[in-house]
Amino acid sequence: MTLGGLVTHTTAPFRAEYDTVVVGAGPAGLMAALKAAARGPVLVLEAASLPRNKSCGGMLNEYAQEFLAEIAPVPPSMVRAPEHVNFRYVDWDRSIRKPTSLRFLNVDRREFDDWLVSLLPANVDVVGSSPVRGFTQDREGVTLTVRVDGTEHAVRCNNLVGADGARSTVRRTLGEGSVSTYVTLQDFCKLEGELEPYFDCIYMRDIGDSYAYSYIVPKGEWGLVGSVYYPKTSRPHEKQDQTMRIIRSALPQLGETVKREASVALHVRSASDIVPGRGRVLLVGEAGGFMSPTSGEGISYAMNSGAAAGAAIASSAPDDALAAYSSGVDHIASNIRRKLRWLPFMESAWGKYLAGFVPTPIVSKVTEGL
């Protein structure tokens, strides 16, 4: 199978040596590959099959849109109706709704990742269904063990980029430890009427302490209802059923659930969760701890950190790439540290209660920084 002329699955051994290997074919990994290809051949390994399916609301904020404007025009074919939605804070129990000026481009996430693959140059190979089993570093480079169709292969590279998400194998193999993760569930509901053109972020109090928030977004003929639960939540599917009953009671236009997806998302709680890498290994996106701890937005963080890693590789000697990358993402790390200071208040019952009394223009302004 090919996408954009690139290898996406193979039963034969691929090349034994690449200049750069990227683990993970999401926005972080693909942007790293795009930039790193300026130095030499790149291999992108994705544990899942391709085209990749990521459980996500598919919302591109203004930072993500600005980033992509410098790469390539977003194809209209992957944009869903309504084309743009604004973020809206919803205190469900008190019927408080506060629309903001934060505006998102509404895309199909599966098609978005597929499109990013098509942007890669000819010296990048993308191979799906190829989980990495481990790797070792030495003074000359990195050697990975990759499993494809039941057979293990060794691949050698000068630099390795870990872009394999919140449960990163690359991060764990480095000995940096895992970052805790939210449990996320997302229902695809057949629409039986129109939803308002908002990306609603919902707080409610009847689900229990394990519940963080829900979101609703219209997506063409579908209504997506996602919920985020804190780490170690027991029986999350039962809690999502309860959440869906409450939401449907007020929004009957949300028809039957046709599909439910389960996934995890990074749960950043400390500046120590941010790890750019070690040696010749660079960590990007959620693997490196790059994600908003206050809003849960990750796509813009993924693309920017991935591009910074790829640019550092392209412009540096292999031994110097990590230092260049760390410098290049220092402003992103500072942004996350600033948001972490707000987090205890935002997650507290008092914080959520007081937000209902804050004038809407102030909520809108604060939201821009989250």
For each feature predicted by the language model, list its residue ranges.
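FAD/FMN-dependent oxidoreductases across multiple families
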Residues: 134, 231-309, 319
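Short beta-strand to alpha-helix junction loop
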Residues: 98-118, 231-241
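C-terminal helical "tail/cap" subdomain of flavin- and related membrane-associated enzymes
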Residues: 311-370
